[in-house]
Amino acid sequence: MSTPIKAVLFDFMGTCLDWHSSIVSALPSPIPQHVKSQFALDWRQMYFDANTARIKNSQPTENIDITHQTTLLQMLDKHPDIAPLFTPEVQARAIAAWHHQKAWPEVREAIRKLKEDHGWEVYVHANGTTRLQLNITRSAGLQFDMLFSSELLGSYKPAAENYLRVLELLKLRPEECVTVAAHAYDLRGAKAVDMKTVYVRRVTDDILEDQEVVRRENDAYVEDMRGLDEVIARL
């Protein structure tokens, strides 16, 4: 008999949030829409690369606003044709946009079902700062039992110590917890410490991952969060 689930831990951006629309809308209006879209995707990937480098070099966690500022400047170096449009005010607006995002349409109801219909604890567990997560939960209208940021935990996902610290704080065993994410690297980290995993496919994320490989790696693979509670109940 499988161990009953007690908690569901969500990655945030991409998994629960349509970060792409928020960032695209904050970029200078003269830039063509398709260029803004690709710029946002590349900026996001550069952020991931920066975090990976910090982990590899055993560096401490960094304020996500600083990382976004640094990577934005690197992006502008790669795009000298549009760089003049990014005045200091525009740069500040683009960075602030990461703090104000909308949830994917089905997410709010999915979280409600997990909490009310099943009685599971529901948490955010994601890289970033606590202030970022607080701002986004308000702008997206989402409610969680607790927000666990890399800033709070002192390490980035997918380092094992990040997941183990959350389990320690929650006083739960790995098999009692499910991680839900749109990022394969995150779920690989969760799986490495024996947590159960559900992958959510989002068009804005994991564009370089082989989805067939990702599907095989996880306990469940879903196209969105409709029926997520039923999927988790079967794990």
Predicted regions and their residues:
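A metal-dependent, Asp-based hydrolase signature
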Residues: S29-Q33, S37-R93
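Short, acidic loop-to-helix structural element flanking the phosphoryl-transfer center
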Residues: T61, D65-I66, A83-V124, A160
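Asp-based phosphoryl-transfer active-site loop
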Residues: T3-S22
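Extreme N-terminal segments of fungal proteins
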Residues: M1-K6, V24, S29-I31, Q45
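Generic structural signal for small/hydrophobic residues in well-ordered secondary structure
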Residues: D11-G14, L72, V124
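Asp-based, Mg2+/Mn2+-dependent phosphohydrolase catalytic module
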Residues: M1-V8, R112, Y123-L235
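Tryptophan-centric aromatic hotspots in well-structured domains and transmembrane helices
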Residues: W19, Q101-W104, F144
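A general structural signal for well-ordered alpha-helical segments in protein cores
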Residues: I23, A40-W43, Q69, Y163, ...
